[in-house]
Amino acid sequence: MLHTLSCSPYHADLDTLLRGLDKGDALVLLQDGVIAALAGGNIIHRLLDSAVPLYALRPDVVARGMTEQISNSAVLIGYNEFVQLTVEHPQQLAW
């Protein structure tokens, strides 16, 4: 399943999201959800502990001026890669 987080992690039920992640899933951070990928923050460590691939939509990171602050553990992707992930994961859950 492809999980997408589009709101600030401070306004999302992060605990429920993390409990819902399973092996084979992927998580894409987009819009304000990219805040969750800030390096050195509490949230990025919780997401990485889930052991699912973590992606952040590059245009949203750039639009927020956060390129230098994003953790190296989050893979920055463009729209084409995002579409490819939707093909690989036909089921999606938006948070």
UniProtKB/Swiss-Prot annotation:
The protein's assembly and partners: Heterohexamer, formed by a dimer of trimers. The hexameric TusBCD complex contains 2 copies each of TusB, TusC and TusD. The TusBCD complex interacts with TusE.
One Pfam family here: DsrH
Keyword Cytoplasm: yes
One Gene Ontology cellular component annotation held by this UniProt entry: sulfurtransferase complex
Protein name: Protein TusB
Compartments, as annotated in UniProt: Cytoplasm
Stated family: Belongs to the DsrH/TusB family.
NCBIfam families given in the database record: PRK13510.1, sulf_tusB_dsrH
Function: Part of a sulfur-relay system required for 2-thiolation of 5-methylaminomethyl-2-thiouridine (mnm(5)s(2)U) at tRNA wobble positions.
Annotated GO biological process: tRNA wobble position uridine thiolation
Keywords for this protein: Cytoplasm, tRNA processing
